[in-house]
Amino acid sequence: MSQAAKNVIVKLIVGAGQAAPSPPVGPALGSKGIKAIDFCKEFNARSANYQPGVPVPVLITIKPDRTFTFEMKSPPTGYLLLKALKMDKGHGQPNVGTMLGSAPAKGPTRALGELSLKHVYEIAKIKKSDERHSLLEMEGIVKSIVGVAKSMGIKVVP
């Protein structure tokens, strides 16, 4: 009995408008028998409405006949939170001084910054447009974003 050919799924995070057949795109698709340049042209055309360089998660489905389809998702929550704070990246130890387990960690508490609930709600609206979040309540998405913000050391204020 021969095994039926199956679809292969490749997950990548590519900068909007910056897909090129160089790593990581080229090797990831080339090893599956797909011409990376075809994906790059289509991705760059579909991501033209994003700011250049915004990281866009992509789910590429490669069929047995070496054709492909791909789904673009909304940018990662951490990226959107940092952009709302007008920062490029956070610091290495966001929650120094907070409770870890039963004893407080040493060092002063360092918050990365503060965001209003309005900013969090705007990020939630972006995430709600994503197909995988479309059935979730807005309150649940906001709570999830607040959790990510807390883990990054960002304080959410009303």
UniProtKB/Swiss-Prot annotation:
GO biological process, one term: translation
Transit peptide: 1-73
Predominant location: mitochondrion
Gene3D superfamilies per record: Ribosomal protein L11, C-terminal domain, Ribosomal protein L11/L12, N-terminal domain
Keywords, ordered alphabetically: Mitochondrion, Ribonucleoprotein, Ribosomal protein, Transit peptide
Pfam families documented for this protein: Ribosomal_L11, Ribosomal_L11_N
Gene Ontology, cellular component aspect: mitochondrial inner membrane; mitochondrial large ribosomal subunit; mitochondrion
GO molecular function, one term: structural constituent of ribosome
Location within or outside the cell: Mitochondrion
Family: Belongs to the universal ribosomal protein uL11 family.
Known role: Component of the mitochondrial ribosome (mitoribosome), a dedicated translation machinery responsible for the synthesis of mitochondrial genome-encoded proteins, including at least some of the essential transmembrane subunits of the mitochondrial respiratory chain. The mitoribosomes are attached to the mitochondrial inner membrane and translation products are cotranslationally integrated into the membrane.
Additional detail: Present with 3200 molecules/cell in log phase SD medium.
Subunit and partners: Component of the mitochondrial large ribosomal subunit (mt-LSU). Mature yeast 74S mitochondrial ribosomes consist of a small (37S) and a large (54S) subunit. The 37S small subunit contains a 15S ribosomal RNA (15S mt-rRNA) and 34 different proteins. The 54S large subunit contains a 21S rRNA (21S mt-rRNA) and 46 different proteins.
Protein name per Swiss-Prot or TrEMBL: Large ribosomal subunit protein uL11m
